[in-house]
C-alpha cells in the first residue's frame, strides 16, 4: 500500500525512541524500541480519533477509539508516554491481560510497562496459539460499519449479480490500485464502490475531477485504471474535499485501502485468493 509516512510507528518511531532514550537515561529510565504507494508528506491532522471533531459541520466522524471504562493506571501511563515522547498523538492506552499496556496511535499499536521504561513495537504473538494479537487488535480498532460509508460519494461498478460488495480508496496514479483492478477483471458477481482519493500528486486531483464529472464515471475510471486511456477533461463541482476529509477520518494513509461488508479493512492490493476469501 502507498501512504504518507506516519510519525507514530515504524522506522520514524524507532528513531524517535532512541533520541528520547538519551534524554530519559539521565533520569534513570531507558526507552527501547507496517504493499502500496506512499503519498508525499505527513497528513494534516484534521481528522479525529476521538469522535468529537468533524472535518466540517455535517460530516460523519468515524472513531478508532473503542469505548472503555475509566482506568487511572492507564491514564497515568498515557501521561508518562506523552512526557517521554513529545509530539506523538496518543489515541488511547489500555491495560492488557498479559501484563503490558497497549498504546494506540491512530491504528498503530505499541506496548509498554507501567512506568514507560521500555517500549516495544509489535507484532505481539500469542506463543500458545501462534495468533498475531497485534494484527487482530488493529483490525478490530480500524473496522468501520460498511453501511455507514457515504456510498453516494463513490464511483460504483457492478459485475455479474453484484452480490459481493467492497469499497476502495484509490488514487488514479497509484500503481498498486491498477494491480488491484487487474485482479478484479478476473472476478465476477461483485460491486466495487471507489472513493477517489487524490493524495499522490497534484495531477491526481485533476484526474479525479475529470473522472467524477464524466457522463459515465464508472466507464472512464475503468478505461483509465485498466486500459490507460486518460480521462477527457470535464468540469463540475467534484467533492474532492469530502473525499479527503473522509479518508482522514478513516485514517486512510495510502492507496488502495479496501473496506469489506464485514467491517474489516485491508491496506494494499490483495491477490485474488485472499480477496475472494474476504468477500
UniProtKB/Swiss-Prot annotation:
InterPro entries: DiS-bond_Isoase_DsbC/G, DiS-bond_isomerase_DsbC/G_N, DiS-bond_isomerase_DsbC/G_N_sf, Thiol:disulfide_interchange, Thioredoxin-like_fold, Thioredoxin-like_sf, Thioredoxin_CS
Function summary: Required for disulfide bond formation in some periplasmic proteins. Acts by transferring its disulfide bond to other proteins and is reduced in the process.
Disulfide bonds: 174-177, 213-236
A cellular-component GO term for this protein: periplasmic space
Signal peptide boundaries: 1-31
Residue ranges of the region described as Disordered: 33-74
PROSITE patterns, sorted: THIOREDOXIN_1 (PS00194)
Name this protein carries in UniProt: Probable thiol:disulfide interchange protein DsbC
Pfam families: DsbC_N, Thioredoxin_2
Family: Belongs to the thioredoxin family. DsbC subfamily.
Alphabetical keyword list: Disulfide bond, Periplasm, Redox-active center, Signal
Gene from which the chain derives: dsbC
Compartments reported by the entry: Periplasm
UniProt biased composition (Low complexity): 33-44
Domain of life (superkingdom): Bacteria
Amino acid at each position: 500500500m502507498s501512504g504518507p509516512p506516519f510519525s507514530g510507528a515504524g522506522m520514524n518511531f524507532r528513531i524517535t525512541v532512541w533520541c528520547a532514550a538519551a534524554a530519559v537515561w539521565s533520569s534513570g529510565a531507558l526507552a527501547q524500541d507496517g504493499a502500496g504507494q506512499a503519498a508525499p508528506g505527513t497528513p494534516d491532522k484534521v481528522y479525529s480519533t476521538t469522535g468529537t471533531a468533524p472535518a466540517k459541520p455535517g460530516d460523519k466522524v468515524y472513531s478508532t477509539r473503542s469505548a472503555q471504562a475509566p482506568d487511572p493506571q492507564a491514564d497515568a501511563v498515557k501521561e508518562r508516554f506523552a512526557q517521554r515522547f513529545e509530539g506523538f498523538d496518543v489515541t488511547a492506552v489500555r491495560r492488557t491481560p498479559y501484563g503490558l499496556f497497549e498504546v494506540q496511535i491512530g491504528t498503530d499499536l505499541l506496548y509498554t510497562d507501567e512506568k514507560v521504561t521500555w517500549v516495544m513495537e509489535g507484532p505481539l504473538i500469542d506463543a500458545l496459539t501462534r495468533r498475531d494479537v497485534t494484527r487482530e487488535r488493529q483490525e478490530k480498532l480500524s473496522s468501520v460499519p460498511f453501511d455507514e460509508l457515504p456510498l453516494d460519494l463513490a464511483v460504483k461498478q457492478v459485475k455479474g449479480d453484484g452480490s459481493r460488495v467492497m469499497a476502495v480508496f484509490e488514487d488514479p496514479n497509484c500503481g498498486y490500485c491498477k494491480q488491484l483492478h487487474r485482479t478484479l477483471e478476473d472476478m465476477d458477481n461483485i460491486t466495487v464502490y471507489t472513493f477517489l482519493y487524490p493524495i499522490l500528486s497534484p495531477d491526481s486531483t485533476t484526474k479525479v475531477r475529470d473522472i467524477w464529472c464524466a457522463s459515465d464515471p464508472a466507464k472512464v475510471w475503468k478505461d483509465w485504471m485498466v486500459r490507460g486511456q486518460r480521462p477527457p477533461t470535464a468540469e463540475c463541482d467534484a467533492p474532492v474535499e469530502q473525499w479527503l476529509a473522509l479518508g482522514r477520518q478513516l485514517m486512510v494513509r495510502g492507496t488502495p485501502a479496501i473496506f469489506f461488508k464485514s467491517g474489516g479493512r485491508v491496506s494494499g492490493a490483495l491477490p485474488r485468493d485472499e480477496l475472494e476469501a474476504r468477500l
